[in-house]
Amino acid sequence: VLDNVMIGALSRTKAVEAARRDAEEIVEFLGMTGKKDALAGSLRVHELKRLEIAKALATKPKLLLLDEPMAGMNVVEQGRLISVLKRVHDAGTTLLVVEHVMHAVVNLCEHVTVMNSGQKIVEGGTREVLANEEVIRIYLGEEDKC
C-alpha cells in the first residue's frame, strides 16, 4: 500500500524520502496505517478504493474527480468512505463526484447537477434538487407506472 501511494507522490517529486514521508502521512490520514505493508491485491473493495484515493491525494490535487466511488460497497463501507471523503474535502481538496447512491450525494455534496440521458435536468443546492418533482419522477418513477 505504501509503495503504491509513493508512486503518486513521485509523480510530483523525485526525492524518494520526501515521497515516502508524504505517502505515510496520507496513509495515516486515510486510516490505512494497519495496511501500509499489505499488497494491493490482498485488499478488499473498500480498501482498494481508499488506496486509489490515497494515490490521487499523493499528487496534491486541488480537484479530485471521483466516478461512482460507492459502487460495489455495502452501506457500512459506504459510510466509511463518505467519512474519508469529507475529511479530504475539509483538508482543502475540491471533490467532483459522479454518484447514484443518494445518501452519499446528500452527505457529500453542497451543489448537485442531475442528468438524465445525457441532458442536464436541474442544478442547485442538494436538498433543493433532490426535492425537485422532475428529479423524483425520473429516479423514482410515476405512481401509475409502478
Language-model regions: role of each:
Residues 1-146:
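Glycine-rich phosphate-binding loops of nucleotide-dependent enzymes
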